[in-house]
Design a protein with these regions (language model features):
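Conserved, well-structured ligand/cofactor-binding cores
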Residues: 1-441
């Protein structure tokens, strides 16, 4: 092996890119670096198998690329993520680092980049980094979050409370029904992500510069895909059309959209939980959120819904990232999209944020939620909308009059209803809150 020590391994093209793009101080995402290494290693092995690359060179290139893939040289990728839109600078960075590690007789372009172009390698690495992290990191965490929410749905299935629409009192529901809805949102969100991944798994590798495959062996791409699939367990696929795969990043835009929908769902869930846990004395107070830390530097005893607030901020960032990805996705002019580093940065950031956010949401919030029976009873008994259950017996207009008088006088619905002629047996039959919450279920 050529170089062992942690010295500067990149060459002149990387240095030029560092000088040209002093933009954000943010480097390309680490999973992308690792997938560049995996692709380069598989490419070297396949080129040797095809008789195109000296076997000894190929072995050294593959060994060096494997070390990049394992994260040993993350610090050797210094180029800003805001760089040339094809990712050429980072592809050259990978070629230079691997060539230096592999030995002086290894050429960064002729050997390490054999059969490849930045235009097919870099987006392929982005696709596979997204496929890998979504499959192996995000989806298992979503399964965990769904299970946590469903466990609470089962725990709270008999606890009746006031429903709310337009932030106003509505007919009763159970707390378990609300959590069942939250679990379904997460489950459906995971399904949307899963449905987007087969398209992400279609990579443009083998198209080289414009999708034609110029300067690459016709068996190169299938064999590289097979090696990567065998090594990772991911089902990596050929594109339906090489020019579609080369000229746009629609599959990544689609995945981002699914991630955005999940963020929208998490926003609803986190907001609901923060509202239901509000108080403890002057607001809704139907649930008790875990007390994790002091909520104020001036108000003693104050506790805030810190985990829902984190989830809300993560969701806002994910939605913002999706907007940037959507705009970047429109820049697939002719044979190449030239906003790929931006897409990579924002998409992998979405996956990372949602993975960590959903994990702490389950572990530090959902698992520890308890029902506040006093608050639930208060909301269930005080909602005037429960009078809706009287409609089949007395009609809408008379029910509306009962609600109006109860609201104006502050008297219980029962007292007003009996006073206006509803017999006691009818009232008690219609106004059983638990039966009411079941609706026609």
């Amino acid at each position: 092996m050529g170089v062992q020590a942690k010295e500067q391994l990149w060459g002149g093209e990387t240095t030029k890119a560092v000088d040209n793009f002093p933009v954000s101080g943010e480097r390309i995402p680490v999973p992308l670096i690792h997938w560049l290494g995996r692709i380069k290693g598989a490419a070297a092995r396949v080129n040797a198998e095809l008789g195109l690359l000296d076997e000894d060179k190929a072995n050294r290139i593959a060994a060096a690329a494997d070390r990049v893939a394992e994260g040993e040289f993350d610090d050797q990728f210094p180029i800003d993520v805001f760089q040339t839109g094809s990712g050429t600078s980072s592809n050259m960075n990978a070629n230079e680092v691997i060539a230096t590690l592999a030995g002086d007789d290894v050429h960064r372009n002729d050997d390490v980049n054999m059969g490849q172009s930045s235009n097919d390698v870099f987006p392929s690495a982005v696709h596979l980094a997204a496929l890998d992290t979504a499959t192996n990191q995000l989806l298992p965490v979503l399964e965990r979050l769904e299970a946590s929410l469903q466990a609470k749905a089962d725990q709270f299935k008999d606890l009746v409370k006031s429903g709310r629409t337009h932030l106003m009192d509505a007919v009763p529901v159970t707390l378990g029904q609300e959590f069942s809805g939250y679990a379904a949102q997460v489950r459906l969100g995971a399904r949307r992500i899963q449905n987007a991944l087969p398209q992400v798994a279609q990579i443009p590798l083998g198209g080289t510069a414009t999708g034609t495959g110029l300067n690459t062996h016709r068996d190169f791409a299938p064999k590289v895909r097979a090696l990567l699939t065998e090594a990772t367990g991911l089902e990596i696929r050929p594109p339906e059309d090489p020019f579609e795969a080369q000229g746009n990043r629609d599959a990544l835009v689609e995945l981002s959209g699914a991630l955005k929908v999940l963020a929208v769902s998490l926003t609803k869930i986190a907001n609901d939980l923060a509202w239901m846990g509000s108080g403890p004395r002057t607001a809704i107070g139907e649930i008790l959120l875990p007390e994790l830390q002091k909520g104020s530097s001036i108000m003693p005893g104050k506790v805030n819904p810190v985990i829902p607030e984190v989830v809300l901020q993560i969701s806002a960032q994910v939605i913002g990232n999706d907007t940037a990805i959507t705009v970047a996705g429109t820049q697939g002019n002719f044979e190449l999209n030239v906003r790929v580093p931006l897409i990579a940065r924002n998409l992998l950031d979405q996956i990372r944020l949602l993975t960590s956010g959903c994990r702490i949401f389950a572990e530090k919030c959902i698992d520890g939620i308890e029902a506040n029976q006093e608050g639930l009873n208060r909301s269930a008994e005080m909602t005037l909308s429960a009078a809706t259950a009287l409609n089949p017996y007395i009609g809408y207009d008379k029910g509306a009059e009962i609600v109006k008088q109860a609201a104006e006088s502050g008297r219980p619905l029962r007292d007003v209803a009996l006073e206006l002629g509803v017999d006691e047996e009818t009232y008690d039959k219609a106004m059983d809150l638990r039966t009411m919450a079941q609706g026609n279920l």
